[in-house]
Amino acid sequence: MNLMLQNLNNIRTLRAMAREFSIDVLEEMLEKFRVVTKERREEEELQQRQLAEKQEKINAFLELMKADGINPEELFAMDSAMPRSAKKRQPRPAKYRFTDFNGEEKTWTGQGRTPKPIAQALAAGKSLDDFLI
């Protein structure tokens, strides 16, 4: 709870702060607190109603499943029994060719970190187009 809310929650602090305001201002603040409290109650009631409706729907589906002879655990068993097809992404084709520091010719797709030999050549003024395959 932040400091302002702690002050509002402490009766002695409220009394001390109230001395600085007129009764009209205090009544206006009180009305605003009532409005905020009412809105908050309505929000919580709405959430409770939505949760109750959701639970009723779940119970209705469970009853329908029991009436048809379907056990809820069977649904989960079916889901785990089916193998998931993980899509294997094809590797990207090489886009650039360069010679590394050991004299070996290597390729780079253009994805990820720029290899050091290419980065040094770019810093020296070469263009990336010079390395295109």
UniProtKB/Swiss-Prot annotation:
SUPFAM superfamilies, A to Z: H-NS histone-like proteins
Organism: Salmonella typhimurium (strain LT2 / SGSC1412 / ATCC 700720)
InterPro entries per the UniProt record, alphabetical: H-NS-like_N, H-NS_C_dom, H-NS_C_dom_sf, Histone_HNS, Histone_HNS_N
Name of this protein: DNA-binding protein StpA
Any one Pfam family match given in the protein's UniProt record, by short name: Histone_HNS
Entry similarity comment: Belongs to the histone-like protein H-NS family.
Summary of subunit composition and partner proteins: Forms homodimers, can interact with H-NS.
Chain's role: A DNA-binding protein that acts in a fashion similar to H-NS, repressing gene transcription. A subset of H-NS/StpA-regulated genes require auxillary proteins for repression; these auxillary proteins (Hha and other similar proteins) may also modulate oligomerization of the H-NS/StpA complex.
Coiled-coil parts of chain: none
DNA-binding region of this protein: 111-116
GO terms for cellular component: cytosol; nucleoid; protein-DNA complex
SMART domains reported for this sequence: HNS
Segments for region (Disordered): 81-115
Stretches with biased composition (Basic residues): 85-95
Location in or out of the cell: Cytoplasm, Nucleoid
Matches recorded under PANTHER family: DNA-BINDING PROTEIN STPA (PTHR38097:SF2), PTHR38097
Gene3D superfamilies for this protein: H-NS histone-like proteins, Histone-like protein H-NS, C-terminal domain
GO molecular function (one): protein dimerization activity
Family matches, as NCBIfam families: PRK10328.1
Keywords from the UniProt entry: Cytoplasm, DNA-binding
Organism domain of life: Bacteria
